[in-house]
Amino acid sequence: MSKPFKLNSAFKPSGDQPDAIRRLEEGLEDGLAHQTLLGVTGSGKTFTIANVIADLQRPTMVLAPNKTLAAQLYGEMKEFFPENAVEYFVSYYDYYQPEAYVPSSDTFIEKDASVNEHIEQMRLSATKALLERRDVVVVASVSAIYGLGDPDLYLKMMLHLTVGMLIDQRAILRRLAELQYTRNDQAFQRGTFRVRGEVIDIFPAESDDIALRVELFDEEVERLSLFDPLTGQVEATVPRYTIYPKTHYVTPRERILQAMEEIKDELADRRKVLLANNKLLEEQRLSQRTQFDLEMMNELGYCSGIENYSRFLSGRGPGEPPPTLFDYLPADGLLVVDESHVTIPQIGGMYRGDRARKETLVEYGFRLPSALDNRPLKFEEFEALAPQTIYVSATPGNYELEKSGDEVVDQVVRPTGLLDPIIEVRPVATQVDDLLSEIRQRAVINERVLVTTLTKRMAEDLTEYLEEHGERVRYLHSDIDTVERMEIIRDLRLGEFDVLVGINLLREGLDMPEVSLVAILDADKEGFLRSERSLIQTIGRAARNVNGKAILYGDKITPSMAKAIGETERRREKQQKYNEEHGITPQGLNKKVVDILALGQNIAKTKAKGKGKGRSTAKTGIVELDMTPKALQQKIHELEGQMMQHAQNLEFEEAAQIRDQLHQLRELFIAAS
């Protein structure tokens, strides 16, 4: 099923890219465990990584620090590798409230979560791709270090069907029930099956638009065909097919029975400890809750909160790392850590926060001590599991630099010839008035300005002051959700306003070629927001414009400022020298404004199979761009209802047309959530 990686791009590597690609590939072939790609803003880091993947033909996991950047990378990788398996693996919760206990007020908070079905399907698709083929790029968030079902048990549970195989209908239905598929002869949807005489239709859990029809003759599989679950049209017949479990957490019956005995043993030991410490209430609470869970597991094969017993279900010892997405990645896989200066510290912090909450639950009798082993990976476990790694950042952290040693690959020269911004340091005393005159100069020539302050109060006061002086200004703060933030950025690019004021939200991954000036107020106040890395990242926001400039307001030059200015000047000199040697004139980027939000548009085109290309499909792509996630979800439910109604009325063309709209909306929802 695997194909070779085939890179689809109209451009050839240029600038520093060819040298960076060569050095990274040589390092990987020489067996280097850690390398760092120091790539400046706009130098085409993703394109460099895509070239490395295509040349070395190795399955790859790309870790991003948040869902927004993961969605952006997924869209880019999907365009680079349209013929290969580019998958998306992020948390499937739209909303998640973990189980917790607050001793001070004696308050127990039940686990409450809302699962996004489309993202769940994409997660299942990602693990299936890793198990079945080698031409895989999985773009994941830090969700990848959280516990997932054991790949060995997952593989054991799969149902393999081949034409000519002897198996009776009841055996197939029993196996489907074990895989947690449910029978539904009326509404045929993901993770269900229906039976009509000797024909079984199965809608695989990891599939979005293809179902399997199993035709039996007596006790023999006569034909296997793939069909469109909406129209019923047969797409192809296949000699064999593998049905994967409906969830990553499915467990064979014998393993559940064995786990139940181990849980009973642990419960008996824990009860003795609690009674010895005179904790009668905790002992009663724990017994009651655990007995209830055991009863459910015995009857149904699972229970609410079954993940708390994952250590027993996967057969691991106390303290052993949980199975994660890394266990599904082949041994010769490649790991790319994007924006590594943010992602690496995130990975380190996940375990401790989770541990503190669970220890309280164990202490007060809500959970058995084994629940502590349902956790994300510790940092040292992540290090042990990670395959050969490339860290990608414009400002690599100390960890990456230490691990890479001399293997820091510079990618400073941009293919467009754009230079790093000119930096000026100006006094604090006149910073606001000076900024106002700079803004007015930019507004006249239709360019935008980013201003970063140290405090929320100052950002609010500055916004108010600029508004009073007739400037079109908006304020970006932490209370604004991801989608609204994207809309503000889009409006800035479209020229709805000229100035965007923020605190710490104007750093990684913002792509705005229209911004020609970045103003950093109080740049001489040494600290987290004015560290060398923060300054370089913020200055980099003006690096996509031909007239890029950064003004640092400060009365003295701090060590961080000196390092940031020195590094920016080093890069600028190297870029200028390259341009002179090769006769390159810097060109401004001409990136379409809708690109930020329409991350899924091209993806949807590759998924849609040329069906239902009516007017409504084209219209959806534009109209839905500025909808909130809630409105998008509502629209998706509404269209799903319409689609099923058309299918029931045998109006298959209309149903297929709506299905194509749904593809687009779901991709937009991923980008937005």
Curated annotation (Swiss-Prot):
Transmembrane segments: none annotated. It is found in: Cytoplasm. Residues 633-668 form the UVR domain. CDD domains: DEXHc_UvrB, SF2_C_UvrB. It comes from the Bacteria. One of its GO terms (molecular function) is excinuclease ABC activity. The keyword Nucleotide-binding applies. The keyword Transmembrane does not apply. InterPro entries: Helicase/UvrB_N, Helicase_ATP-bd, Helicase_C-like, P-loop_NTPase, UVR_dom, UVR_dom_sf, UvrB, UvrB_inter. Residues 431-597 form the Helicase C-terminal domain. ATP binds at residues 39-46. Keywords: ATP-binding, Cytoplasm, DNA damage, DNA excision, DNA repair, Excision nuclease, Helicase, Hydrolase, Nucleotide-binding, SOS response. One of its GO terms (cellular component) is excinuclease repair complex. A motif (Beta-hairpin) lies at residues 92-115. Pfam families: Helicase_C, ResIII, UVR, UvrB, UvrB_inter. Signal peptide: none annotated. Disulfide bonds: none annotated. Forms a heterotetramer with UvrA during the search for lesions. Interacts with UvrC in an incision complex. The beta-hairpin motif is involved in DNA binding. Belongs to the UvrB family. The UvrABC repair system catalyzes the recognition and processing of DNA lesions. A damage recognition complex composed of 2 UvrA and 2 UvrB subunits scans DNA for abnormalities. Upon binding of the UvrA(2)B(2) complex to a putative damaged site, the DNA wraps around one UvrB monomer. DNA wrap is dependent on ATP binding by UvrB and probably causes local melting of the DNA helix, facilitating insertion of UvrB beta-hairpin between the DNA strands. Then UvrB probes one DNA strand for the presence of a lesion. This is UvrABC system protein B. The lineage of its organism: Bacteria, Pseudomonadati, Pseudomonadota, Gammaproteobacteria, Enterobacterales. The gene is uvrB.
